[in-house]
Design a protein with these regions (language model features):
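Secondary-structure end/capping motifs
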Residues: 216-304
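Short, glycine-/small- and polar/acidic-enriched structural segments
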Residues: 24-165, 172-178, 194-195, 202
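Sec/Tat signal peptide C-region and signal peptidase I cleavage site
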Residues: 17-23
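Pocket-lining segment of extracytoplasmic ligand-binding domains
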Residues: 81-83, 154-155, 161-257
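Cleavable N-terminal signal peptides
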Residues: 10-11, 21
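Predominant activation on well-ordered alpha-helical scaffold segments within soluble catalytic domains
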Residues: 40, 85, 139, 182-185, ...
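Conserved C-terminal helix/tail region of periplasmic/extracytoplasmic solute-binding proteins
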Residues: 291-329
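Bacterial N-terminal signal peptides that target proteins for export
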Residues: 1-9
């Protein structure tokens, strides 16, 4: 008599799995950043299928990936916590369910030869994309150096054009993230990073941001995606897998593993335990809530949007916490 409930529960579980796999695939827009290219590991190894969820990853440049999300072409997008606020205030709200990483050196202020520190930028021109993370990074560097935003002149420059602009000597420094920051160092001999995200860890968190509608309709599928992500993070944390990780990630962006390795070093991929700490609500850059408050203040100051955004509406730690509870059993 006891076997019937067990058989019934097994049947229901199989039906649920089949239903998930037969549903429309979850569509995730992603772009060229190590913490997001890392999803490719799960794709290549078939881990999403093993988890019982169908996911389609859509490759874009960064800004077009957010545009795709806003226009409804994707259910989720990989973006920074600060840009999630901008996207929500000006286009479409989202909810971050995974903190993939924080930038740990890949975002840089790269200066021309002869400029040795942030203080040397006084009265100089800096090329960067106004209102984006590189702008926030520069302001953070200026503040740490006891300077003001008015001490430099911002030349609004698309991030992917910053290497050429620095090489042309139209500006004295640029703000960009990898691979553009690295390219800037290559094209102008003698240039150097004078401030990076490693000098302000937590200024930029990288997240998986999901549409509230998709999250409500397919919560269990997004939980499966969360499980796969932390399987990826664990795989990346094992030094024995480094060659395979570099091979997979570099192939996605069409460069060599040797060229890709510095990008990986400048990205702090978060383990489950690390992520739980970053989901704390304490102020400061050590948490995503504190970091998002800094980003919100920046966005208001530079009129990226007019009304303050409540970070709590954009962040949902429950998926990470639920996985931690599963693993603790």
């Amino acid at each position: 008599m006891k076997s019937f409930p067990r058989l019934a529960s097994t049947a229901f579980a199989l039906l649920a799995m089949c239903g998930s796999l037969n549903a429309e695939p979850l569509k995730i827009a992603y772009s060229d950043w190590p913490g997001w290219v890392a999803w490719e590991i799960g794709v290549q190894k078939g881990w999403f299928k093993e988890a019982g969820v169908d996911v389609e990853f859509l490759w874009f440049d960064y800004v077009p990936s957010m545009d795709a999300y806003v226009s409804g072409k994707a259910d989720a997008v990989c973006m920074t916590n600060g840009d999630a606020l901008v996207t929500g205030a000006t286009g479409k709200p989202s909810v971050a369910i995974i903190i993939n990483d924080f930038s740990n050196g890949n975002d840089m202020i790269v200066a021309a030869p002869g400029i040795e520190s942030i203080k040397d930028l006084k009265g100089k021109k800096v090329g960067l994309e106004e209102g984006f993370v590189s702008h926030l990074l520069l302001l953070t560097g200026l503040e740490k150096a006891g300077m003001k935003a008015e001490d430099v002149t911002i030349v609004n420059t698309p991030t992917n054009e910053t290497p050429q602009v620095l090489a042309s000597k139209a500006v004295d420094a640029i703000g960009a993230w990898q691979p553009n920051s690295g390219q800037a160092l290559k094209v102008l001999p003698g240039s150097k990073p004078i401030f990076t995200s490693a000098d302000a860890p937590g200024i930029i968190y990288d997240v998986l941001a999901v549409s509230p509608e998709s999250l409500e309709k397919r919560k269990e599928d997004w939980m499966k995606v969360t499980r796969v992500w932390y399987r990826i993070a664990d795989y990346m944390a094992d030094e024995a897998n480094l060659d395979d990780v570099l091979k997979i990630l570099s192939a996605r962006v069409k460069i060599t593993p040797e060229e890709y390795e510095p990008f990986l070093k400048g990205t702090a991929i978060l383990s489950l335990a690390d992520a739980l700490k970053r989901w704390d609500t304490a102020p400061g850059l050590g948490t995503i809530y504190g970091s998002s408050k800094v980003a919100d203040d920046f966005n208001l100051r530079f009129k990226v949007y007019e009304k303050s955004q409540d970070a709590a509406k954009y962040l949902d730690p429950s998926f990470t916490k639920a996985l931690a509870a599963e693993k603790a059993k």
